[in-house]
C-alpha cells in the first residue's frame, strides 16, 4: 500500500472516530458540526498529500493535531500551555491552511499539479499571529449632524475641541485555545490602565473549553474590579450557553450586567444613559421597540446602546441610539483588512455590518472587531482589536 493510501485511510478513519466520540460525549448536533468540518478538511488534506509528500512526517503530524484538537472538545476544558502549543494551535493552523487551500485541491482533482499550494499555509501562519496578538490603538468617532437614509458605512470624522467620551470596548474574547486566561487578563489590565470613562463588554466571553468552571472567566476579568461603577456588560449569543456562569463571573469582577436594562452614569464628559440589550435570535424588531419604550431617552444624556449583534441595528427605533456598540462578527474574521481593503467574508455574503463605523438616520453604530476567534479556526486578514474609542459629540443631544 502506498504512503498516500495509508495517509488517506488514517485521516478519514481518525475523523470518523472523532465524530463518534463527539456524538457519545456531546450529542448529535456537535457531532454533525465536527463531521462536516473534518470531512471537508480531511478531503482537502488527502488531495494535497502528494504535493507535500517530501515532508510527509510534518504533514501527517499536523493532520493528527487537527483530529486530536477536535477530539479533545468532546471533554472540553481549558488546556495547559504545552497542549495548546503542540496540539491546539498547530491543529487550528493546519485546519485553516487546508481549507484555504481548497482551490489547489480542486486543481489537483483535474490532474494539474497544485503549484504554490504552500501559499495557503503561509497565509494561515500569519493568521495564527493575528489570532493571538493584538495591537493597542486609539480611534476617534464623531457623532455628526448628518442624517443617513439607510444603514451604511460612515466616515469616522475628526476630533473636536471638546473633551470626548473615552470608552474601552471589549467584545468576543472567546476564552479558549487562542485566548488564555493570562491573555484576557492582560487585555483587561491595559483597559484599566488607560483610565477610560467607561469600559463596556459586549458579550461572547466563552467557548466550549472555558465553560467548565466560573473561576476561568472570573480570573480573566478580575482586573476590571479596579474601576467598579464604570464597567458594564451585555450578553452575546454564546453567553446564553452558560448564563449563570457568565453572571457569576461578571459579578465577581464588579461588572454590572445590563439585560434589557439601563444605567445612568456621570462621567467627566457628561451624563450618559447606557442601555444593555439582551441577545435575541428572533423577534428582534419587537424586542428593541419594547426596550426603547421601557427606557425612553433621558434629556441631555448621551444615549449609548450595547447591542451584541450589529445585524439588529436596523431594527432599533430611529433616534434611539446616539452610539450603538456591537461585536459578534469578529470584524468578518476572514478578509482583506490587512491589505487596506474593507472586504470581509461577512460583507461579501451578508448585509450585516461587519466592522467599523456605520450610520442610519442620526443613529451611529461602531462594530468592534473583537479579540477572540470562533467558527473558522483562525483570523485571516482581519486583526483583533484592542482600542480606546474617543467619542466626539458634534451635535445637540436631545
Model-derived regions, located:
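Non-catalytic terminal accessory segments
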Residues: 1-136
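Hydrophobic, well-ordered secondary-structure segments
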Residues: 107, 119-122, 138, 184, ...
Amino acid at each position: 500500500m502506498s504512503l498516500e493510501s495509508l495517509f488517506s485511510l488514517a485521516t478519514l478513519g481518525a475523523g470518523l472516530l472523532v465524530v463518534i466520540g463527539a456524538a457519545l460525549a456531546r450529542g448529535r448536533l456537535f457531532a454533525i458540526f465536527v463531521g462536516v468540518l473534518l470531512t471537508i478538511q480531511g478531503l482537502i488534506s488527502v488531495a494535497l498529500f502528494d504535493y507535500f509528500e517530501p515532508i510527509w512526517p510534518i504533514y501527517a503530524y499536523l493532520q493528527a493535531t487537527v483530529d486530536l484538537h477536535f477530539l479533545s472538545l468532546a471533554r472540553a476544558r481549558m488546556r495547559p500551555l504545552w497542549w495548546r502549543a503542540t496540539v491546539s494551535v498547530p491543529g487550528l493552523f493546519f485546519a485553516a491552511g487546508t481549507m484555504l487551500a481548497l482551490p489547489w485541491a480542486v486543481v489537483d482533482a483535474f490532474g494539474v499539479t497544485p503549484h504554490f499550494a504552500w501559499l495557503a499555509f503561509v497565509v494561515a501562519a500569519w493568521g495564527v499571529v493575528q489570532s493571538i496578538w493584538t495591537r493597542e490603538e486609539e480611534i476617534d468617532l464623531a457623532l455628526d449632524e448628518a442624517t443617513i437614509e439607510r444603514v451604511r458605512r460612515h466616515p469616522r470624522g475628526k476630533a473636536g475641541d471638546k473633551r470626548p467620551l473615552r470608552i474601552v470596548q471589549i467584545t468576543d474574547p472567546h476564552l479558549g485555545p487562542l485566548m488564555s486566561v493570562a491573555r484576557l487578563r492582560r487585555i483587561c489590565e491595559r483597559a484599566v490602565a488607560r483610565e477610560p470613562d467607561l469600559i463596556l463588554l459586549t458579550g461572547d466571553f466563552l467557548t466550549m473549553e472555558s465553560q467548565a468552571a466560573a473561576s476561568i472567566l472570573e480570573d480573566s476579568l478580575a482586573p476590571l474590579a479596579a474601576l467598579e461603577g464604570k464597567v458594564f456588560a451585555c450578553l452575546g449569543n454564546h453567553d446564553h450557553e452558560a448564563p449563570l456562569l457568565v453572571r457569576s463571573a461578571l459579578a465577581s469582577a464588579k461588572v454590572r450586567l445590563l439585560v434589557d436594562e439601563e444605567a445612568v452614569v456621570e462621567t467627566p464628559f457628561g451624563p450618559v444613559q447606557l442601555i444593555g440589550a439582551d441577545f435575541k435570535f428572533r423577534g428582534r424588531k419587537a424586542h428593541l421597540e419594547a426596550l426603547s419604550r421601557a427606557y425612553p431617552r433621558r434629556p441631555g444624556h448621551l444615549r449609548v446602546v450595547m447591542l451584541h449583534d450589529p445585524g439588529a441595528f436596523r431594527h432599533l427605533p430611529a433616534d434611539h441610539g446616539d452610539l450603538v456598540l456591537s461585536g459578534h462578527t469578529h470584524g468578518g474574521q476572514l478578509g482583506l483588512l490587512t491589505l487596506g481593503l474593507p472586504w470581509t467574508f461577512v460583507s461579501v455574503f451578508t448585509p450585516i455590518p461587519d466592522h467599523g463605523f456605520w450610520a442610519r438616520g442620526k443613529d451611529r453604530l461602531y462594530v468592534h472587531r473583537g479579540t477572540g476567534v470562533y467558527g473558522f479556526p483562525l483570523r485571516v486578514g482581519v486583526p483583533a482589536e484592542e482600542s480606546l474609542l474617543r467619542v466626539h459629540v458634534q451635535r445637540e443631544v436631545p
